[in-house]
């Protein structure tokens, strides 16, 4: 659906892997521990299509922003989850396969090119800033720490790039989960 219509996508922590992290339409994880580009993309969108997301404080950093001055479409198979933490403009109860089959049968006539160009530029700036901070942090630690120290963020990124494309990543709860979600490169729409 997103590819057919060129729709930018973000993900909660639980939804990571729905799209590969290097997919051109994927702008990052949202929430308190989310990525800058993902949060900004969602907060500045005119329409937010939430699929199976709970809108809890950890998954959405500012629930008020996803309902403020925008259309919120919330799809979930469980009617109890819809509107639980943020009131949708359009609630849709159903199996996402059936909902998206119906969506895909329609032709959207919306031009997102300007929005996508802005998001791509912003993502490139954020990624460059992030890489610079990561490199500086590694350089600073090399000066202060022993040679046995490995920056966990760099380790997770390097390990994920070395893994098979269909690898499934597992992270325990804690800071390592946050590092994994923020730094692992998930390809082929796998799982975190």
Residue ranges and their predicted role:
Residues 1, 60-63, 158:
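A short acidic, amphipathic alpha-helical/loop segment
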Residues 6, 76, 88-94, 143-150:
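Short, exposed beta-strand "edge-strand" segments with a Pro/Gly-rich flavor and a Y/T-containing core
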Residues 7-8, 50, 60-61, 70, ...:
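Generic hydrophobic/packing signal
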Residues 15-125:
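Glycine-rich, acidic loop regions that bind phosphate or pyrophosphate groups
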Residues 123-192:
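Active-site diphosphate/adenylate-binding microenvironment
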């Amino acid at each position: 659906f997103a590819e057919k219509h060129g729709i930018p996508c973000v993900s909660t922590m639980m939804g990571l892997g729905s799209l590969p992290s290097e997919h051109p339409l994927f702008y990052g994880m949202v929430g308190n521990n989310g990525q800058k580009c993902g949060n900004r993309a969602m907060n500045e969108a005119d329409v937010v299509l939430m699929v199976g997301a709970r809108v809890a404080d950890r998954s959405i950093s500012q629930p008020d922003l996803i309902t403020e001055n925008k259309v919120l479409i919330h799809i979930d198979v469980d009617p109890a989850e819809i509107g639980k933490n943020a009131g949708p403009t359009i609630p849709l109860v159903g199996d996402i396969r059936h909902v998206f089959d119906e969506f895909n049968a329609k032709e959207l006539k919306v031009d997102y090119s300007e929005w996508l160009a802005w998001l791509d530029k912003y993502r490139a700036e954020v990624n460059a800033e992030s890489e610079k901070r990561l490199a500086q942090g590694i350089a600073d630690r090399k000066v202060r720490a022993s040679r046995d120290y490995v920056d966990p963020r760099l380790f997770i990124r390097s390990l994920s790039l070395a893994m098979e494309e269909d690898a499934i990543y597992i992270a325990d709860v804690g800071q390592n989960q946050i590092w994994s979600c923020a730094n692992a490169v998930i390809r082929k729409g796998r799982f975190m």
